[in-house]
Amino acid sequence: MTILRQFFRPRRPQVRRQLPPSHWVQPWWVERYKEQIKNQKLEPPQSNNVARSWTLTGNLDSSHRIAVDPRGLITVKPGSWSLDWWLGVDQTWLYPAQHGSVRQRLVDGAPVVETVIRVAGGDVIHRVYAARVDGEYIVVEVENRASRPLALALAVRPYDHLGGGRVDQIELNDRTLSVDGDVALICGRSPGRLVVGTGGVDPASLLNQTASTDRSITCETGMASAVIIVPLVHGSTFRSAVPLGYTNDAQVIPKLPSAQQVASGWGKHAVSACRFVLPPGLINDLFDASRQSLLLASTGKDVEPAPGAPPRESTDGAATLMALAEAGYRTTVREILISRAKRQDRLGAVTHRNQDVTGATVIAADRALEVAPDPSLAHALSEFVADGTRWMLANPVDGTAEALIAAHKILVRVGAEKAARELSNLLIPIVKSDETTIEQDENLDVVELARSAFELAATDPPEAWRSLEKLASLASPTSSWPSRVNSNTRRGTGGAGHDLRVTAWFVRAVLRLLVDDKDECLRVAAVWPDQWHAQGVEVHQVPSRFGAVSWAVRWHGDRPALLWEVEGGPSDLMVIAPGLDSTFQGEGPMGEQLLAPAAPQNHDVWAPSDQGGTSSSGSFS
């Protein structure tokens, strides 16, 4: 009978995920759509293809990546719900998605996102970042630096940064808010009240009502929404946390690190890999932030460079892994390569998200072993490379020729002479085009622009800087890029709103202009922008196939002095610095040379920021 009752029990109608009615407070991308078409009556599309821009945050070596939109909306569970924030001032409510005086930034270039709104004579700062305390959490805190007390509303919304969602049930139990049976938000203190909306009613329209005693809401159409409201006096901060796993620890809030502590941790990871002291400017700021956010591409076992975008090319994963290796994140790359090798099937293939990444893995492994020699890792990967080579020979695709050359280099490196010799007879020369064509329509492929900057860095450094300048102009205030962008609105139109493939190519391009080991000689300072004239630069411990490279420039009047050191570099190493002195040729792994007088070249490279100052100079110890 129990089985029969379950079989004949009325089933809840399945409603497709859709945006709430137009009279609701909508996400930022819908507001931008209305602004763009200038027709408030026209219904917005059900999926976001007009403003695909956001910023990712998360923990190191974690599969959880959380998107924060330009107004602070947090997509906690894509396709289901997000967490918004609103402010109440004298019975008037401000919605950041609709407000013009909102700006966004990172804390010290780390994936700690601050959304700032100017209100009541000061700033209110909304912060989002990830932390680990016996589990993973997204910390959400709001600080009142305004001159007056405010009301803060945190709203569970049945939509996200890409389109509609679905929420059936919301319940508040003391300081814990649950969505569809799962703990969704843990508050630092008990909320003052809960405002709920169902049946098509937006709780945003009920915020000033004080009679509500509701503690839960159920909506069969999947449009449940609820708002917790707390007072926020001047100088105070309200903290809460979104668990990224199963937890009911209501006492976790005091244990969570501060935003500054988390930002410092990210910065230490970047500096421990390699360190740079560059003149202040937009490129420097983006380079600093990009080297940190690049780590978000790693899940610990693989790379996810473009969350929210359809698969593109397996070589994008290779470029991301190579960027991690070239930026000095040796341990991260090692763990990913070992994880992929363990997943290799009997035929020699390895896949990721149903995509063959065998060749991409071999290419990345070759570069990783080239810039950071690791005999134990090389031997551990040798069988993987041999089996993968057999698979690639039997199943050639675009990029196979490059992958086979990489495989040959690895086999030579581990002393597998017979296998390397057999493979060398099968290698096909790689013919690359001289230049990459970028589409010149209003929807710009940002991934290709970044890729072309990297390629140009080897052959035409000044043109590479101009590409980097264009790329920098398309970056968000939080140093992120979408996959495709409208060149007029500067908003994403396709793919991922924060595409770490762009970040990877950008980092590789800047690194190649600073330290390039592509040819038989070591090239440093490939280009020297006018804004750097008479300013010192320091580069420390950049991985290369010659060894870890450090160099610095000091100025003596109009003459730059170049110091360089390559750990373990060959005694006959040739060093050039064409951006400073095209006639200079240094020899040896260590040296110092006073170069020819240099004058600004009037290269139209990039516009610097308003910051001033010069880098310090000193030894590499």
Residue ranges and their predicted role:
Residues 159, 339-343, 387-391, 429-430, ...:
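A short structural micro-motif
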Residues 300-303, 343-352, 396, 475, ...:
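Acidic/His metal-coordination segments adjacent to aromatic residues that form catalytic metal sites
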Residues 398-425, 446-449, 455-473, 478:
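Extended amphipathic alpha-helical segments enriched in small hydrophobics
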Residues 170, 178, 185, 234, ...:
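Aromatic-rich carbohydrate-recognition surfaces in CAZymes
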Residues 216-220, 268-378, 436-466, 471-472:
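Substrate-binding groove/exosite segments of carbohydrate-active enzymes
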